[in-house]
UniProtKB/Swiss-Prot annotation:
GO terms for molecular function: mRNA binding; translation initiation factor activity. Belongs to the SUI1 family. Gene3D superfamilies: SUI1-like domain. PANTHER family: DENSITY-REGULATED PROTEIN, DENSITY-REGULATED PROTEIN HOMOLOG. This is Protein translation factor SUI1 homolog. Keywords: Protein biosynthesis, Translation regulation. SUPFAM superfamilies: eIF1-like (SSF55159). It comes from the Archaea. The lineage of its organism: Archaea, Methanobacteriati, Methanobacteriota, Thermococci, Thermococcales. GO terms for biological process: formation of translation preinitiation complex; regulation of translation; translation reinitiation. CDD domains: YciH_like.
Amino acid sequence: MPRIVNPLDEMLFKEVLKEQQRIRVYIERARYGKLKTIIEGIDEKEFDLEDIAKKLKAKLACGGTVKKGRIELQGDHRDRIKKLLADLGFSEELIEVE
């Protein structure tokens, strides 16, 4: 007999997972001395990194991609990224910005 999953339980589970994610935000130098903001620590098995990246790129008006299980955004967005991730449901206390 197949297991019936309550959609509400699944949503609550995702919210709890969001609040437990330890996220690290830092800067790397890209080609030609340009900066990129790196966001890592979001579980790619539980969350759609492409969707999160798409939302962040729209809010920050920048380009970016998902590579090796991390989100890369063009430019230095450390000052705004913590609030934007919190707006997406991640715990601000667990977001470390370097």
